[in-house]
Every structure is written in structure tokens, then in C-alpha cells.
């Protein structure tokens, strides 16, 4: 079994009789000598969908669950439900809008390549996105000529409604690459 310091976002823990999907990890370094590093983890309870927060020391042993990952394509929206189709056997996987609320901020209309669903023991757990996505800038302050030398940023609204900081020289209509986990601009899209 792994230690708490080996846990990554997207893993599932079996903790206190609950299946918890890791959504976010904050590492709190000790200020006193001899103190242990604390890992504050935010989870989503797989069965109930509730948000859970727990703290672990770096050397705490945790019980992880082995997941099955299947590549999927976005298929369609049915009211409040989003349906994804398995690329190999065309099995439909259905998520409610609340279950994948954060993922939808990065998903362009029509979906994106390399999306995966995570299942355990036949139970649908989560939708996992690739590391990067290319999105179009819909709204931002106009680009300033000669601003490429400065390192200043400005907010930009993307085609999915997500707002991130981009360099000043970018203008509406340009496609940019976003790092999903860090929510940051990486560069212009190819």
C-alpha cells in the first residue's frame, strides 16, 4: 500500500469505508524541526458525490483502489446528463452535470481526444481529461502593439466560459493551449 506522499490527483482511496476520488492536494510543509509534512486532500465521495476533506502525514499508509480506464468520446447531452461512448465496445457512460462540473469548463463543444472514464467493479467513478486542451479566446482586452516584450497578463474568456490569464499580445479569435490541471496558458495552439 502506498504512503500519503505518493498519492496523485485522480487516484481513488478506500478510507473509512468510503471510496474517495482525489480532486486536489495541498502540501503543507512543516515550520518546526521534526514536524511531518501534511497533505491536505480534497475528495469527492464516489457513492454520494459529497465533497470530503482529509489531512494525512506524508508517511501515513493509505489504501488505494485499482481502477479500470476506458477511452471515450463525447456523444450527446440529454437534459442534465452528459453521455460518453466507449471507443472500443460503444458502451454508453452517463454523468450528471454536477459530477463533471469542473471538467466541462475545459471541454470544447463536441468533446476532445484522449478522454477516459474511470470505473471500479463496474461502477462509474469519474471522467478524466488529457493534460492540455486547445480553446479559442472569445473575449479579452485588445492586443497592444509592441506588448510582446512585456510579461504582463490580462484576463481572457475562452469558448467554454473559463477565464484565465493570458499574455497582453493575444486577441479574440486566437486559439491557445491550456494546461488543464494548473489552469494556465501554455502557448498558441498549432
From Swiss-Prot:
SUPFAM superfamilies: Nucleic acid-binding proteins (SSF50249), Translation proteins SH3-like domain (SSF50104)
Pfam families, A to Z: EFP, EFP_N, Elong-fact-P_C
CDD domains cross-referenced by the UniProt entry: S1_EF-P_repeat_1 (cd04470), S1_EF-P_repeat_2 (cd05794)
Transmembrane segments: none
Any GO molecular function: translation elongation factor activity
SMART domains documented for this protein: EFP, Elong-fact-P_C
Cellular component per GO, a single term: cytosol
BP terms from Gene Ontology: peptide biosynthetic process
Disulfide bond residue pairs: none
Superkingdom in the source lineage: Bacteria
UniProt xrefs under PANTHER family: ELONGATION FACTOR P, TRANSLATION ELONGATION FACTOR KOW-LIKE DOMAIN-CONTAINING PROTEIN
HAMAP family, sorted: EFP
Family according to the record: Belongs to the elongation factor P family.
Protein name, per record: Elongation factor P-like protein
Amino acid at each position: 500500500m502506498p504512503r500519503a506522499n505518493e498519492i496523485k490527483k485522480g487516484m481513488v482511496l478506500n478510507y473509512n469505508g468510503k471510496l474517495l476520488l482525489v480532486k486536489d492536494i495541498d502540501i503543507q510543509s512543516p515550520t518546526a524541526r521534526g514536524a511531518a509534512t501534511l497533505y491536505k486532500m480534497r475528495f469527492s465521495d464516489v457513492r454520494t458525490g459529497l465533497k470530503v476533506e482529509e489531512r494525512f502525514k506524508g508517511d501515513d499508509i493509505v489504501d488505494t483502489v485499482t481502477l479500470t480506464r476506458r477511452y471515450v468520446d463525447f456523444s450527446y447531452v440529454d437534459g442534465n446528463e452528459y453521455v460518453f461512448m466507449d471507443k472500443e465496445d460503444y458502451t454508453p457512460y452517463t454523468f450528471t452535470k454536477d459530477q463533471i462540473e469542473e471538467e466541462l469548463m475545459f471541454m470544447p463543444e463536441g468533446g476532445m481526444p484522449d478522454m477516459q472514464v474511470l470505473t471500479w467493479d463496474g461502477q462509474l467513478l469519474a471522467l478524466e481529461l488529457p493534460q492540455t486542451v486547445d480553446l479559442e479566446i472569445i473575449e479579452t482586452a485588445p492586443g497592444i502593439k509592441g506588448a510582446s516584450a512585456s510579461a504582463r497578463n490580462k484576463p481572457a474568456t475562452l469558448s467554454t466560459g473559463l477565464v484565465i490569464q493570458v499574455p497582453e499580445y493575444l486577441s479574440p479569435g486566437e486559439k491557445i493551449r491550456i494546461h488543464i490541471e494548473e489552469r494556465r496558458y501554455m502557448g498558441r495552439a498549432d
